[in-house]
Design a protein with these regions (language model features):
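Acidic, polar-rich N-terminal leader regions of halophilic archaeal proteins
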Residues: 1-131
């Protein structure tokens, strides 16, 4: 299911329609059932590549983050130390994707969105995808 968020005064709310549930399969590891991903797409080309932009915003804080997986795209586990929210951020296909985890709340997602908008000075379209 895909929902395009209305650009209301002050921007999107980042309300989370589906929370993923963490499961621990017998064979080991962790899996998630259900998902919500916010897909952010700049409406004009930013001055720097999206991966560099995301890394700069994360480095400037208030974030602790790591890109700990060897994947063909950047995937960061992010903690906003201001809001306490933890979520994943990926960069793929000209978009920045915010992946909700079980305890993620809207303020952390909104804060990263606001920092991307402030850093680029361009509008961003926001799409909410649920599974």
């Amino acid at each position: 299911m895909t929902t395009y968020l209305e650009m209301m005064t002050g921007g999107p709310s980042f309300e989370i329609p589906v929370r993923p549930e963490r499961t621990f399969p017998f064979r080991g590891g962790v899996e998630y059932e259900g998902s919500t991903t916010f897909v952010l797409c700049p409406e004009a080309d930013p001055a720097e590549p999206l991966t560099a932009l995301v890394e700069r915003v994360l480095t400037d804080g208030p974030y602790r983050y790591g890109d700990f997986l060897n994947l063909p795209m950047p995937l960061y586990l992010v903690k906003d130390t201001g809001t306490g929210d933890v979520f994943r951020v990926s960069v793929r296909g000209g978009t920045v994707r915010l992946h909700v985890l079980p305890a993620t709340e809207p303020p952390g997602l909104r804060a990263l969105y606001d920092r991307l908008v402030d850093r680029t000075g361009v509008a961003w379209a926001v799409e909410c995808r649920t599974d």
